[in-house]
Amino acid sequence: MGNSFSSVRDTLAHILGAEWIWLERWQGRSPKALLDPAAFPTAQSLKSRWETVERDQLQFIEALTPQRLSEELPYINQKGQRYSYPLWQQLIHVVNHSSYHRGQVTTLLRQLGAEAVSTDFLVYFDEKTKSQR
């Protein structure tokens, strides 16, 4: 369908895998591979793992200090190459990466005739606030 990945599931698994691998890197580990999309045969299995990664991300982010955000954080990518960037830049990279692929998911859903949800950040907060009333 002219996308980076062959399906909605594979695209979502890629987003999840990238968020997971970056969290691992921020904690001093450098996994050699992303999560395998085949490990998520159902939407529920993907959602369950995503909830775990999201919880772990939140714990990590809540503990950050301004000093920690500005520190250079080295990591080794999947090809074995070493890199180092300030943590704040890595965080922005992950947000941008996920946003890019969420846009692809939206396009795929529309091509499949499904109604796509909004990926706007502020719309998310508006809806979240309304649901908490």
Predicted regions and their residues:
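Helix-adjacent hinge/juxtasegments
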Residues: 29-70
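Short acidic-hydrophobic surface loop/beta-edge motif
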Residues: 73-75
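Short, contiguous alpha-helical
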Residues: 1-36, 78-133
